[in-house]
A protein has these predicted regions:
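C-terminal catalytic "cap/lid" subdomain
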Residues: 1-96, 100-315
Length: 316
């Protein structure tokens, strides 16, 4: 699979040791694989967690999951440390990196969204590896993992990785975690089996995804939410175990690894993907059955088909 644009997301659990400190060997192995993939002609965008964990280790403090400002302070201390290791490891392969910190507002505002797209595209043209993380210092959407009204949270960067894939027209999203993929039930329970391919997000799939990861905030549930967005956007997504040797290279070589979420339908145009998943919801329009059918056919919505409006929003 050469010449492809791939978004690789690695979660906190894959980057830290059992004591919560950064696992530099795991980071180095991931960088080695990305470097090889790039030299084979692929373009890689890395979406990484781990800033808070790095900050906790640097400041020599105990984790306090209920103190939001504490987590933000740790992220501020840890982000530069996280990047310094990535820069060092990629430099060994002759590759340069660029830090990109984003918030939900950056992707929900159309102008900021387009600027982000342009910068990422230019970095890739320059042969630079964009390394993306949510800006935990100014945004709490990620560190408070709940659905906020009708907006989608980044949820430990799972959702963010797919939004970035949409923004850059990526060919594939790979989410690396601490399990082999999606199981029929918790992999710690007897009788659990790996689900190799998912073609539709069913209630059974959602039930199989219940539970959270030890260090991360998202867990499998938000990975399924991310996968559903990718599938609807026409982008395949794979969940795989970061601890598997050469996991990323095997995926790019076409080997079946982890759980593949197949896209369905045609690939959405960029503007429709942004409207569907990037723009924050400001209100609702209730339409009649005729208008619904017209919209599903791709036709325009006429005023006669509107039955009700709620919320405050502007044209466009």
């Amino acid at each position: 699979m050469a010449g492809k644009l791939v978004v690789v997301k690695v979660g906190t659990g894959s980057l830290v040791k059992s004591d919560g400190s950064l696992n530099l060997e795991s980071m180095r192995r991931l960088v080695d694989q990305i470097a090889k993939a790039v030299k084979e002609g692929n373009k890689i965008i890395l979406v990484t967690s781990g800033a808070i964990a790095a900050g906790i280790a640097e400041l020599k403090v105990k984790p306090n999951p209920n103190d939001i400002v504490f987590k933000q302070a740790c992220a501020a201390a840890g982000q530069s440390i996280l990047m310094s290791y990535y820069r060092e490891f990629f430099k060994a392969h002759g590759l340069k990196v660029a830090q990109v910190l984003l918030t939900e507002r950056d992707l929900s505002d159309r102008i900021s969204y387009l600027h982000t797209c342009n910068v990422l595209d230019r970095l890739l043209q320059l042969g630079v590896i964009p390394i993306i993380n949510e800006n935990d210092v100014t945004s709490i959407n990620e560190i408070i993992p709940v659905m906020k009204g009708q907006k989608i949270n980044f949820s430990d960067n799972d959702i963010l990785s797919v939004l970035i894939a949409n923004a850059t027209e990526a060919d594939l999203v790979v989410i690396l975690t601490t399990v082999d993929g999606l199981y029929t039930k918790s992999p710690e329970k007897p009788g659990a089996s790996l689900i190799p391919v998912v073609e539709k997000i069913t209630p059974e799939i959602r039930r199989a995804a219940e539970g959270k990861s030890r260090f991360g905030r998202g867990g499998m549930k938000t990975k399924i939410q991310a996968a559903e967005i990718a599938m609807q956007s026409g982008i395949p997504l794979i969940i795989a175990n970061s601890n598997r040797e050469n996991v990323l290279l095997d995926i790019l070589d076409g080997k079946h690894v982890g759980t593949l979420f197949k896209p369905y339908g045609r690939k959405l145009p960029s503007i429709k993907k942004w409207i569907a998943y990037g723009a924050g919801t400001k209100g609702q329009i209730k339409v009649n059955e005729g208008a619904k059918k017209a919209i599903l056919r791709g036709a325009s919505l006429l005023a006669v088909g509107i039955e009700g409006v709620s919320g405050r929003f502007q044209i466009g």
